[in-house]
Amino acid sequence: MEFSDELLASLRDARHIAVFTGAGVSAESGIPTFRDALTGFWENYDASTLASPEGFAADPALVWGWYEWRRTRVLRAEPNPAHYAIAALAADCPRLTLITQNVDDLHERAGSADPIRLHGSLHHPRCSACEAPYRLPPGIPDEPEGGRRVDPPRCARCGAPVRPGVVWLGENLPQAAWDAARQAAEDCDLMFSIGTSALVWPAAQLPALVARRGATVVQVNPAETALDGHAGYNLRGAAGKVMPLLLQALRRSRP
């Protein structure tokens, strides 16, 4: 894959790069996306019901079991070349802000520090009533391949069931994370949008905000998305292939 001189110059000259990642990045590590069909124990359930406050209120064991199954899948997965290239890019620019819609920890395991998590984390549950954080036991849960119902633990402070630390459908994004993401979008010289459909709002407005400011948007995606018209560069391909090649080209282009 070849990259234009203009793109490489924009990367070299950027004082602040923002990287916005979606489910497509984690999918290359074998993590199912939210739109993938459910399998095993979950095949007769709707993900939009499981990922909702109403679903948890109706059947906490069903919802907690689904998220423990998902967390198990994540902990058994490994970061892919896109995760590592994004982490390495931080050492090649004055400032890099990583914003992710993903709820796994693959960015951190690849070496990225302090990503802004718009949709929360599978690894940081909290009390469903008083919101006290709950510390998960170390290691990988002993969950069957197909999944199962699991009663959620109880909060040590108030006794209410612990809930997954993610943003469910209908819930607001964490205000601090959203404010930090918007600030990065308003300040950066260049934003990568990688592996995201650009359909999930309000997060999807971040690249469009960058484009409206006249800053550069670079989209990395194997398929067309709603962002195509806003992006200055559309790099077609899997992030795990495109990002390492782009990082190599950037380093070769430096004097």
From Swiss-Prot:
Write out the entry's keywords from A to Z: Cytoplasm, Metal-binding, NAD, Transferase, Zinc
Q: Which GO terms describe its cellular component?
A: cytoplasm
Main site of residence?
cytoplasm
Required co-factors? Zn(2+)
Catalyzed reaction equations: N(6)-acetyl-L-lysyl-[protein] + NAD(+) + H2O = 2''-O-acetyl-ADP-D-ribose + nicotinamide + L-lysyl-[protein]; N(6)-succinyl-L-lysyl-[protein] + NAD(+) + H2O = 2''-O-succinyl-ADP-D-ribose + nicotinamide + L-lysyl-[protein]
Q: What EC number is given for this enzyme?
A: 2.3.1.286
Q: Where in the cell is it found?
A: Cytoplasm
**Deacetylase sirtuin-type domain boundaries:** 1-253
| Active-site residues (renumbered) | H119
| SUPFAM superfamilies for this protein | DHS-like NAD/FAD-binding domain
- What does the record give as the function of this protein? NAD-dependent lysine deacetylase and desuccinylase that specifically removes acetyl and succinyl groups on target proteins. Modulates the activities of several proteins which are inactive in their acylated form.
| NCBIfam families per record | PRK00481.1-3
Annotated protein name in UniProt: NAD-dependent protein deacylase
Organism of this sequence: Methylococcus capsulatus (strain ATCC 33009 / NCIMB 11132 / Bath)
Q: Which gene encodes it?
A: cobB
